[in-house]
């Protein structure tokens, strides 16, 4: 990725009230985006958001900027990120904009864009928007100003889209499911999708108040879901993150099922049904157990850089239709254009219903290697800790000790000043010790 001033790996993100997530910046961003994107004739932009309290302020600022550039805004209200991608396509809009910081706490927020075809904006377009932001705002003539309106049936449209990805001949009537919506954008979508497909649904994390998004609930913290699945004796649990582009599951025994395992289940089922084309794309963080399990099935596997945009790029490069991150981003190009937690979860449920198998049994063909991840915060602008000789030396020692039976991955977060230290191998105690040894070296820099 080229050096850009504002856009990171997943749009623009930060703490609300601090640059760049301020009303004046977002207004100018809306204007600059309008200038760059107003080229296809519809002059409409879809704007969706998650349930953060700051979404009201930021959508108003975006709308003002777009209107000044002559584009009209169509508001969806709280809506999952993949729903905005879908609605952008179906409305033939110039673009879709999502106001969300995904799995981050409520005091963060962000802006990300979708192209007219429902895919994330290419780097070149983001760079063009940044270049436009260096100019002074100019307002179009009064008669050409944009308008604002709401899509009153946005939720219903997306619910029907999700249900259409589930086979007509199957039902969820035999399943008791706990669904955790992270007090986020899926709160009024996912429970209804599952109920309408016949499931007995117990909903948690479905009472957003503007400040409780991702707070001890959702895909990034499944403890509440695990406890509820066990207490209710449910068949499984499904957790989404704040904006609904991630899914993590829990089996009837309370075991966490991550994005690697979800992709394994979907890929294997696609192979069984004769629908899998090509291979599967993971990331540098994908578990070695996934790679080995797919190879045993004869399914090619390749790793992309971390980030769902890079998974998608690799999928397009290979002509493959399935990719995922272990964090729960699952991209199924035969179904949609971006990571969609609800759609991915439905494909796992279809495999359960079709084969009359539990989630636990569907995972049994894949042995997960212990994988320890330690996040180390560093001071932005103080140099690259990964280039320090002491960090390189400790990393080399660990890699030599693991040999071919494990891996080490050090990388910077694309959205926060964090170094992510990942060590993977056969022995959990050993990889834990190795991960903390490297993390200590990073902290000491």
From Swiss-Prot:
Species: Escherichia coli O81 (strain ED1a)
Protein name per its UniProtKB record: Phosphoglucosamine mutase
UniProt KW keywords: Isomerase, Magnesium, Metal-binding, Phosphoprotein
Gene transcribed to yield this protein: glmM
Residues involved in Mg(2+) binding: 102, 241, 243, 245
Free-text cofactor note: Binds 1 Mg(2+) ion per subunit.
Organism lineage string: Bacteria, Pseudomonadati, Pseudomonadota, Gammaproteobacteria, Enterobacterales
GO molecular function, one term: phosphoglucosamine mutase activity
Spans traversing the lipid bilayer: none
Pfam family, one: PGM_PMM_II
């Amino acid at each position: 990725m080229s050096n850009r001033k504002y856009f990171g790996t997943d749009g623009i993100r930060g703490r609300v009230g601090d640059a760049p997530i301020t009303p004046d910046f977002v207004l100018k961003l809306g204007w600059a985006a309008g200038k760059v994107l107003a080229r296809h004739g519809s002059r409409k932009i879809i704007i969706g958001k998650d349930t953060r309290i700051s979404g009201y302020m930021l959508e108003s600022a975006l709308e003002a900027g777009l209107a000044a550039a002559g584009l009209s805004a169509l508001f969806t209200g709280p809506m999952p990120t993949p729903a905005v991608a879908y609605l952008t396509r179906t409305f033939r809009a110039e673009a879709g904009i999502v106001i969300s910081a995904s799995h981050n706490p409520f005091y963060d927020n962000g802006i990300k864009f979708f192209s007219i075809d429902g895919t994330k904006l290419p780097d070149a377009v983001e760079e063009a928007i940044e270049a436009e932001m260096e100019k002074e705002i100019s307002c179009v003539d009064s008669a050409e100003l944009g308008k604002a309106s709401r899509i009153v049936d946005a939720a219903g449209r997306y619910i029907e889209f999700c249900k259409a990805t589930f086979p007509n001949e199957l039902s969820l009537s035999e399943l008791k499911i706990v669904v955790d919506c992270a007090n986020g954008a899926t709160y009024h979508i996912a429970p209804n999708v599952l109920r309408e497909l016949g499931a007995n649904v117990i909903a948690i994390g479905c009472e957003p108040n503007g400040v409780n998004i991702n707070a001890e609930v959702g895909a990034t913290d499944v403890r509440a879901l695990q406890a509820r699945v066990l207490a209710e004796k449910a068949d499984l649990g499904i957790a989404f993150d704040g904006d609904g582009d991630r899914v993590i599951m829990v089996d009837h025994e309370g075991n966490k099922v991550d994005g690697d395992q979800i992709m394994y289940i979907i890929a294997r089922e696609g192979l069984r049904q004769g629908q899998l084309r090509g291979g599967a794309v993971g990331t540098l963080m994908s578990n070695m157990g996934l790679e080995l399990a797919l190879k045993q099935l004869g399914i090619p596997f390749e790793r992309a850089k971390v980030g769902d945009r890079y998974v998608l790029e690799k999928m397009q490069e290979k002509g493959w239709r399935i990719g995922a991150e272990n964090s729960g981003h699952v991209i199924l190009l035969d179904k949609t254009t971006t990571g969609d937690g609800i759609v991915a979860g439905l494909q796992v449920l279809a495999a359960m219903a079709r084969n009359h198998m539990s989630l636990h049994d569907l995972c049994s063909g894949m042995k997960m290697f212990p994988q320890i991840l330690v996040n180390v915060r560093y001071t932005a602008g103080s140099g690259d800790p990964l280039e320090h000789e002491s960090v390189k030396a400790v990393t080399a020692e660990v890699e030599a000790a693991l040999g071919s039976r494990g891996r080490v991955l050090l990388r910077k977060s694309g959205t926060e000043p964090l170094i992510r230290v990942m060590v993977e191998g056969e022995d959990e105690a050993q990889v834990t010790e190795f991960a903390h040894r490297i993390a200590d070296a990073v902290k000491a820099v």
